[in-house]
Amino acid sequence: MADCCVRTCPRPMCIPPSYADLGKAARDIFNKGFGFGLVKLDVKTKSCSGVEFSTSGSSNTDTGKVSGTLETKYKWCEYGLTFTEKWNTDNTLGTEIAIEDQICQGLKLTFDTTFSPNTGKKSGKIKSAYKRECINLGCDVDFDFAGPAIHGSAVFGYEGWLAGYQMTFDSAKSKLTRSNFAVGYRTGDFQLHTNVNNGTEFGGSIYQKVCEDFDTSVNLAWTSGTNCTRFGIAAKYQLDPTASISAKVNNSSLIGVGYTQTLRPGVKLTLSALVDGKSFNAGGHKLGLALELEA
């Protein structure tokens, strides 16, 4: 007799994001495509041997300060190793070594050090991250002469629902210096995120992909003990495969617009402007220009 039973496969579980990436889709709509008050150049190249070079330079139009960074990265895929060297115009040198999916699947260990020859200041950090279905854990240890600081986070996810906790324990003071909690829900085109930081800062964000070319985001924040509430709306529209326009406004009447155009493969230009709606005729508005080159 034929087997009439119908087998249903269990719904695949997704790996939740890290605590720092909760609400990232909404933040990206507010942050990407804008660069007010800066003239910026980013260059990314890759050698034949697989070494990646990233250079970034920017000039602040208000202060005239010029800053830059240089980063080289080499991935030894056979052993899951990544070596990164960093330098910036503050003359701070950084070295990072990471190993991923070698000790066990989903585990990443990172050793990060920085050194400033001008001041002699040194710092070291060991980072660990473990992610599997329904869970994303992180634990970092900052080494300091006064005593290490321990940063921990955990995010749990089930059928689109997310819950996370983040803490920092300062061993020198023997107390928690940070205690944050977040709850969220996400689907393919909708994300909701709420968070409480140290019991005093409350925030929330909504991300909605209205259609294939149009994304919107709403952000709300409030601090207890004050009457200050921060509210903002942002949107991004993809004009065509090579061009997009972004806009945002907040309750302080600050209006930002940005236009991004891919001039050719590997060359991207971004123009942005920030207008103060409360003092439109008084000036103080900001412009921004960014050029990204990748080869």
From Swiss-Prot:
Key words of the record: Acetylation, ATP-binding, Ion transport, Isopeptide bond, Lipid transport, Lipid-binding, Membrane, Mitochondrion, Mitochondrion outer membrane, NAD, Nucleotide-binding, Phosphoprotein, Porin, Transmembrane, Transmembrane beta strand, Transport, Ubl conjugation
Compartment(s) where it occurs, according to its Swiss-Prot or TrEMBL record: Mitochondrion outer membrane; Membrane
GO MF annotation terms: ATP binding; ceramide binding; cholesterol binding; oxysterol binding; phosphatidylcholine binding; phospholipid scramblase activity; porin activity; voltage-gated monoatomic anion channel activity
Single GO cellular component term: mitochondrial outer membrane
Positions of modified residues (N6-succinyllysine): 32
Gene3D superfamilies documented for this protein: Porin
Post-translational modification: Ubiquitinated by PRKN during mitophagy, leading to its degradation and enhancement of mitophagy. Deubiquitinated by USP30.
Record location of the Glycyl lysine isopeptide (Lys-Gly) (interchain with G-Cter in ubiquitin) cross-link: 32, 65, 73, 121-122, 125, 173, 278, 286
Reaction equations catalysed: chloride(in) = chloride(out); K(+)(in) = K(+)(out); a 1,2-diacyl-sn-glycero-3-phospho-L-serine(in) = a 1,2-diacyl-sn-glycero-3-phospho-L-serine(out); a 1,2-diacyl-sn-glycero-3-phosphocholine(in) = a 1,2-diacyl-sn-glycero-3-phosphocholine(out)
Modified residues (N6-acetyllysine): 32, 121, 278
Organism domain of life: Eukaryota
Ranges that cross the membrane: 38-47, 51-59, 66-76, 81-88, 92-101, 107-116, 123-132, 135-142, 149-157, 162-170, 175-187, 190-197, 201-210, 214-223, 230-239, 243-250, 254-263, 266-275, 285-294
GO biological process: binding of sperm to zona pellucida; mitochondrial outer membrane permeabilization; mitochondrial transmembrane transport; monoatomic anion transport
UniProt free text on domains: Consists mainly of a membrane-spanning beta-barrel formed by 19 beta-strands.
Task of the protein: Non-selective voltage-gated ion channel that mediates the transport of anions and cations through the mitochondrion outer membrane and plasma membrane. The channel adopts an open conformation at zero mV and a closed conformation at both positive and negative potentials. There are two populations of channels; the main that functions in a lower open-state conductance with lower ion selectivity, that switch, in a voltage-dependent manner, from the open to a low-conducting 'closed' state and the other that has a normal ion selectivity in the typical high conductance, 'open' state.
Subunit structure and binding partners: Monomer, homodimer and higher order oligomers; formation of higher order structures is necessary for scramblase activity. Interacts with ARMC12 in a TBC1D21-dependent manner. Interacts with KLC3. Interacts with SPATA33. Interacts with PPP3CC in a SPATA33-dependent manner.
Name of the protein described by the UniProt record: Non-selective voltage-gated ion channel VDAC2
Organism: Mesocricetus auratus
Gene it is expressed from: VDAC2
